[in-house]
Amino acid sequence: MNKDNTLHTIMKITMFSEVSVGISANSILFFAHLCMLLGENRPKPFHLYIVSLSLTQLILLITMGLIAVDMFMSWGRWDSTPCQSLIYLHRLLRGFTLCAACLLNVFWMITLSPRSSCLSKFKHNSPHHISGAFLFLCVLYMSFSSHLLVSIIATPNLTSNIFMYVTQSCSLLPMSYSRTSTFSTTIAIREAFLISLMALSSGFMVTLLWRHKKQAQHLHSTSLSSKASPERRATRTILLLMSFFVVLYILENVVFYSRMKFKDGSMFYCVQIIVSHSYATISPFVFICTEKHMTKILRSVCTRIINI
């Protein structure tokens, strides 16, 4: 029993720490890029995508914090409406995060494409096309996740093994094998498509970086080889985030299938939640640390606070 209590406490501290740190980091990233976006005469699409991604991740972590409260604290039970609304919103925001990360990769691939490339003709209209694609994918996610509005219920008082644990107040109704297979296949195809798109765009950017490095070595230019351009730094940042995202996605699926295999209702579920929200927590730190103007803003703010 003591071992279970210790694991429960560790999971609770880890989850709330992840949520609080992620909310703080995404808030800083969101407001910093929003100020840049509003302060520019010609707003850069890159700032718009970072604002969208950080806002989505911020709301996702806030929603996750509310769900975590119901998982670990007995502050009164929810009825079906809060359960359905929060779980549905949480599922949507997770899908939106994947879409935003994928489309950021695609946008940067189009931005870096040379004039001779077939992608160059999309440069001027890429923000409009990508925004339209994002809205289309959002509507698609909303329709595919709509079954949660009827599958999620308030956990009944009676003890039963037919309900799948979600939180203390919420449970998932069992579905037929055909419905489960349909939803699982649809989700797998959708996410495989988006991750494949991310992988292709990342491969394209790696090729461009390699060519740029070869050209710099050929020209024997120390200025090109010793100091990376803002485009190269941004490309490395996005590639790093892409690699991190894929690793976490694979790890999350391993934990999910372990949960299904061992029929564990809480332990593997908590680990899965922590892993699945790690990207939303860590990615803003990657952007903050790799963008020079962000570090300058934070240093100036810290200096002003210290001087006060």
UniProtKB/Swiss-Prot annotation:
Which cysteine residues pair off into disulfide bonds?
C83-C170
Give the InterPro entries listed for this entry.
GPCR_Rhodpsn_7TM (IPR017452), Vmron_rcpt_1 (IPR004072)
The record's listing under Gene3D superfamilies reads: Rhodopsin 7-helix transmembrane proteins (1.20.1070.10)
Q: Subcellular location, in the record's words?
A: Cell membrane
Keywords associated with the record: Cell membrane, Disulfide bond, G-protein coupled receptor, Glycoprotein, Membrane, Pheromone response, Receptor, Transducer, Transmembrane, Transmembrane helix
Q: What Pfam families does the database record attribute to this sequence?
A: V1R
**Can you list the GO cellular component terms from the UniProt entry?**
plasma membrane
* Name of the molecule in the record: Vomeronasal type-1 receptor 92
